[in-house]
């Protein structure tokens, strides 16, 4: 019961961010390509019951109370979740009047302990400009207002903006996670996170890098995610012209991204450097969501 049933956008894919002042030029390309109106379209869905690796705290390397009881058996490879449900979906990131922005093969594995492992193979159409971000967005209960994360903090950090941050475990309230900008724009991100926990009112949601499977390369094993927990949606921060116009959504807005593109300096300087753009033709994104009792 972490995710609010009253929310309009309980869970969705996202590629849009509220444009920063430095996005003032590229935002016109993003909007022309429909990034601000993009949504996920399913082309094929298959489900099956599987026996797969359990995603318990020991496997994830984090602490926290389980939500419900773990149902597991032991084998030579360790704990195995019994009767996990695997949902495979062929999807597209689409917008009106344009071809699919990206194709996605998505697998959700719902384990007996309540954890959900997510793996996405993403193939971006090279005809489109680089993405502002790619990940998932969830609207959690407003009462889940306490955040702890392991990543670059305590100041906001991005792939090209992190010299004032360091790796560690940090805690803050959701109201403290954002940066109050006079002109609302993207803010409050934390780069290279290995886990994050959002909690309140007796429940918590743990977010951990990886889906429990063996990575194909050491780089994949070490890759963290970008994490954000704010009072406002990206759409609201895009709409508002001044900070006093912002309307809190009434939920805790959580974003977990494979990556956000960098901030750059294109309001008065050069375009964002290629190494800081999310423009890879193909990438894999894997995280695990685990409900807990706080």
Feature map (PLM): residue ranges:
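Beta-strand/loop-rich accessory regions of lumenal/periplasmic or secreted enzymes
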Residues: 4-294
């Amino acid at each position: 019961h972490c995710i609010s049933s009253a929310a309009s956008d309980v869970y969705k894919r996202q590629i849009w961010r509220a444009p920063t002042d430095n996005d003032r030029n590229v935002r016109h390309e993003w909007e022309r390509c429909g990034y601000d109106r993009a949504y996920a379209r399913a082309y094929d869905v298959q489900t099956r019951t599987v026996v797969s690796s359990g995603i318990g705290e020991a496997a994830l390397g984090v602490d926290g109370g389980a939500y419900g009881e773990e149902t597991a058996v032991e084998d030579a490879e360790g704990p195995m979740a019994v009767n996990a449900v695997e949902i495979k979906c062929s999807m597209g990131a689409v917008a009106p009047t344009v071809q699919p922005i990206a194709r996605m093969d998505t697998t959700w594995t719902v384990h007996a302990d309540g954890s959900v492992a997510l793996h996405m193979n993403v193939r971006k159409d090279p005809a489109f400009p680089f993405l502002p971000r790619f990940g998932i967005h969830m609207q959690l209960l407003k009462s889940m207002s306490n955040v702890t994360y392991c990543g670059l903090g305590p100041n906001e950090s991005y792939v090209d903006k992190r010299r004032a941050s360091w790796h560690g475990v940090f805690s803050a309230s959701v109201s403290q996670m954002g940066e109050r900008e006079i002109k609302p724009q993207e803010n409050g991100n934390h780069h290279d996170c290995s886990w994050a926990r959002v909690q309140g009112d007796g429940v918590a949601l743990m977010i951990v890098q990886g889906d429990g499977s063996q990575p194909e390369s050491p780089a994949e094993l070490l890759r963290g995610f970008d994490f954000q927990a704010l009072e406002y949606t990206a759409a609201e921060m895009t709409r508002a012209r001044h900070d006093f116009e912002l309307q809190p959504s009434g939920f805790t807005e959580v974003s977990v991204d494979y990556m956000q593109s960098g901030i750059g300096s294109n309001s008065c300087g050069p375009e964002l450097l290629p190494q800081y753009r999310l423009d890879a033709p193909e990438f894999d994104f894997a995280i695990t969501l685990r409900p807990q009792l706080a």
